[in-house]
Amino acid sequence: FQTDLWQPGMAIVDFTNPEAAKWFAAGVRKLCEMGVTAIKTDFGERIPTKAVYYNGADPIHMHNYYTYLYNKTVFEVLEEYYGKGQACLFARSATVGGQKFPVHWGGDCSAEYTSMAETLRGGLSLCSSGFGFFSHDIGGFEATASPDVYKRWCAFGLMSTHSRLHGSTSYRVPWNFDEESCDVLRFFTKLKGKLMPYLFAQAVKTHTTGIPMMRPMVMDYTDDIACRYLDQQYMLGDSLLCAPVFRKDGVANFYLPEGKWYDIITGKTYEGGKYHAVTCTFMEMPVLAKPNSVVTFGAFENQFEYDYLEGADAMICNLEDGKTAEASIYDTKANLVLTIQATRKGNVISVETSSTDKTFTVSVAGTDKKITLQGGKGEIVL
């Protein structure tokens, strides 16, 4: 099958033919040798249902299964070249089993608020179907976003598992919109860099358990009826709730389950068990640490792959009397390097960390209380 639709000489490779798959893999390997570390496996969904396959497969069945073979072929080349656990795609199409070849993104959204909200709904649907990670075209793909839409999408995109600026007919670089867009993109990029110890630990959990890193509220709060219908917010890992702004007036609407929730950007605390409407500047988006949680932060904000333990710190968020909260830090090879446990009794929080030769600071959200440890135990008096 050959077409000249997007560029001359495009063709659909028959991955049921071992020689064809081998030929395609060799091309990918050449890219690796040039220094390419990840591959965008675009398309894969427009597979004709009247095609004849090398192995005689039913073309109706192959319409969905094709993308599995396509992504598998590319993923395995990357894994072979860079090592186990180092392969990464940016895949457009998927089917059952496709979660084994991450990451997937929702392609070709429009550059407007309604499409931004639809993008989140699609991502939550994907992650509810067993896919661990999700990305999207920051700023929208079709047309060109207004500066306000672009800035809100930057916040949403950087607080997704994976982040990429992308567009069809115009560049999505921030200086093409306005000066503040540069500031917004810089701020949320740095926030993501600081959150990497937390985010990477959550990614390791997703890899080992299959629990999606970005997920609808109902997956964590199955007994809270209100969480069954929430499609404009999500959990980013176990401890952070994100509520993007989908309105020109800057209002973020979100619901919080019971307990006190701490906004790691503004430092404000919100009561759970009810809905909230919060007006946000472009430098704000509700990113709320749930009650009885520990969120870890790294020492670097301008890079994403570093020693996550070096200069790291942790924040205990609204730990209730009699409750225990835990967190872990992994190195970039997914080896566990630190565990932290905090238990509250009355006005005293007992903190215990696994042994380490590096100092580690633990603070209490919304207060000036903190303690510095180098392995071992300590107490924080509230």
State the predicted function of each range.
Residues 53-72, 178-185:
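Non-catalytic scaffold segments within catalytic domains of secreted glycoside hydrolases
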Residues 44, 110, 139:
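Catalytic metal-binding/acid-base residues of hydrolase active sites
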Residues 1-14, 50-62, 165-176:
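Aromatic- and acidic-residue-enriched carbohydrate-binding clefts of CAZyme catalytic domains
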Residues 24-51:
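Active-site groove signature of glycoside hydrolases
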Residues 1-34:
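Active-site-adjacent "subsite" loops/lids of carbohydrate-active enzymes
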Residues 75-87, 94-105, 118, 122, ...:
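Catalytic core of carbohydrate-active enzymes
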Residues 270-276, 372-379:
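Short, solvent-exposed S/T- and G/P-enriched segments that are highly enriched in secreted/extracellular
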Residues 1-6, 60-71, 105-125:
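Acidic, His- and aromatic-enriched active-site or binding-groove loops in soluble protein domains
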